[in-house]
């Protein structure tokens, strides 16, 4: 075995050494079966690497159990696989569930596996390169890193177990694939977290319209979720989403908000949120060690974090009409020909007082039957110039006959439609 024969690159200038970053790792536990994930390996010698498992996950549990039994943990590392297998491996499945079963569901057929020759664990049959290895029962005792992380930041020095590579096999003219941080990794993480959040909200009985694992949240910590809301769903959605994986901050909005438009999301927060009512903070939740905002923790201790949810949906008890969107006058009906060589380009007819008075009575007759917005009045009497309609409406106001209904439509002062002054 000579790992130096592989073109394992450096990703950033402060990396601790060449890193295997895109290996799909399969491990076998005698009780829980197969677990699959993506972990990085810093090359230390021609047949020795580290394995970065500082975060609490199923692979870490497998390694810990093997350490307690003072036995090596057999693993395979499949490099150069289909993206579907990378997606599946990145999913944080329940203990005892093999992530390759999830990949098979995405693919629509079972993922093809093959048996290793030197360890009792399978590997991905379509891989370009396969490493057969063991995680030695040394514990988290060896320095490893640093490494440019998915956070867009340089990580610190980690303490990790040691991996001994026992065999290397590859295809003829094999292609070595390296996952570069943060962008490739970021886009691979987003779909798995999207699916996990959607499932959690489905279990909570919340109807989801869409989910955006935001790029600014490195598609890992931040989610913006639009829902078809029923009473109480905003808070229920927050609680469900914050329970997923390492999600840290969640914004829930109504289904009229585009979760992929940051201006709309910010607008929803600005116009629909009262901080004392709509912001939820959960302290001492399990955190991820790579979060640079966390205080340093002792070696081997999993950090805790604060999770924040913002319910930016329209609250129960708030009148829906407060959120009626602006519709611009004539935006859908205006034509350039109305203004160039058309009616608006001609000299306006000077309406006499007699014409204005007659028009005012016609408008009053209509408003006696039904309230109308000003633009509807102007449209109904479009044979008159707009200015004439405005003057006729003004005349009704001068005569103290004009009023408005609760929606702001024009009506007659003494009609059943007229708004009443609040007490």
What kind of feature is each model-predicted range?
Residues 2-78:
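Internal mixed beta-strand/loop scaffold within catalytic domains of large alpha/beta enzymes
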Residues 404:
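Short beta-strand "wing" residues that participate in macromolecule-binding interfaces
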